[in-house]
UniProtKB/Swiss-Prot annotation:
Identification of the protein by name: Tail tip protein M
GO cellular component annotations of the record: host cell cytoplasm; virus tail
Role, per record: Part of the distal tail tip which plays a role in DNA ejection during entry, and in tail assembly initiation during exit. May bind tail tip complex associated with tape measure protein and allow tail tube protein polymerization on top of tail tip.
Family statement drawn from the similarity comment of this UniProt entry: Belongs to the lambda-like tail tip protein M family.
Subcellular location: Virion; Host cytoplasm
Pfam families from the UniProt entry: Phage_min_tail
Predominant location category: virion
Gene name of the encoded protein: gene 17
Domain of life the protein comes from: Viruses
Length: 115
C-alpha cells in the first residue's frame, strides 16, 4: 500500500494554525498533590487547521484528495514543521463555492501514527 503525499503548497498568509490534543491521566489527592502521566505511547496528537481558497480545478483536486483520507493516512509537512502522517479529522472537511472562480476548502488534519 502506497501512502499518498499532500503536495499542494500552503500559503503562510492564510495563517495556518497547528495545535495539539493531549491524552493524559490525572489523579488529584486530598492534600492538593496531583499525579499526571501521559496515556499511551502517543499521548500528544498534533492538529492542523487547513484552508485553501483558489481556482476551482485545484480546489476540487484538494477536496477529492482529502475525501480519500478521512480514514487513510497521508504524508504532510506543515509550514515550519516536521513531516508526519496525518488524516482528515471526522466531520471537518468543507467546500464552499464563493463564485465561479473561487472555491474554499477547509479541514482539520490530525496526526496519525500508522497508515
Amino acid at each position: 500500500m502506497t501512502i499518498e503525499t499532500f503536495s499542494w503548497g500552503i500559503k503562510v498568509s492564510s495563517q495556518p494554525t497547528e495545535g495539539s490534543k493531549d491524552t493524559v491521566r490525572k489523579i488529584q489527592f486530598g492534600d492538593g498533590y496531583a499525579q499526571v502521566s501521559g496515556s499511551g505511547l502517543n499521548d500528544e496528537i498534533r492538529t492542523y487547521e487547513f484552508s485553501f481558497s483558489g481556482d476551482p480545478i485545484t480546489a476540487n483536486e484538494i477536496h477529492a484528495f482529502l475525501r480519500r483520507h478521512k480514514v487513510k493516512s497521508f504524508i504532510f509537512t506543515p509550514p515550519f514543521g516536521d513531516t508526519a502522517l496525518w488524516r482528515v479529522e471526522a466531520d471537518t472537511l468543507k467546500k464552499v463555492v464563493k463564485n465561479v472562480k473561487v472555491i474554499t476548502v477547509t479541514a482539520t488534519f490530525e496526526q496519525a501514527f500508522a497508515p
